[in-house]
Amino acid sequence: MYNVIFLGAPGSGKGTQGEVVAKELRLAHMATGDLFRKAIERGDELGDTVKSYMERGELVPDEITISVVLKHLAGLKDVSGIILDGFPRSLRQAEALDEALVKQGEGIGRVIYINVPEDELVRRLSGRWVCRSCQSPYQCGCAEVAEGKCSRCQGELYQRPDDTPETVKERLKVYFSKTAPLIEYYRSKGKLSEIDGMAEITEVTKRIVSAIKCGK
């Protein structure tokens, strides 16, 4: 199985790119944020715990994240590969993933780092609205946000609690202190491909696909 990690700060576009690239390359797509939001929707103890961290802009503790993700990965069947979006987010998570994959006789094929300047990240996140049904993102000022309706599935748009200006600053602070070190971790292993996230969306997709294919 060919495993690809998407790294990037909140607002870098890794979620959008993960979905598009997964479809193009026929890979499974796992977004940690989606797994957590499903837990929150269930309203169980795990969901309540996850919600409290996400609303403060903090990372969900490693032990919880590792358990949720590895359980999900173990349940995947008949897939040729997977794009991991939002995991790992710390060196401890990266080491846990490496260990789990080695036990299965697998490894990381390629790590895609989508690089976007911090001021642009703040702009994107503070103005981001998301569809409750399909999770499609929209920027403040577009027709869909004005109407409050998703153009893809007609679902209701809302602003996530973790996308408010105050929480955005905390999320980025956490990212640069805990997740950014993974860039050098994977670069040292010769697995990292850095992509300019300021390019047009279609161009970013093209560069990511090329990097993954070249890394195989």
From Swiss-Prot:
SUPFAM superfamilies: P-loop containing nucleoside triphosphate hydrolases. Residues 31-60 are annotated as: NMP. This is Adenylate kinase. AMP binds at residues 32, 37, 58-60, 86-89, 93, 160, 171. Residues 127-163 are annotated as: LID. Its main location: cytoplasm. It comes from Dehalococcoides mccartyi (strain ATCC BAA-2266 / KCTC 15142 / 195). It comes from the Bacteria. GO terms for biological process: AMP salvage.
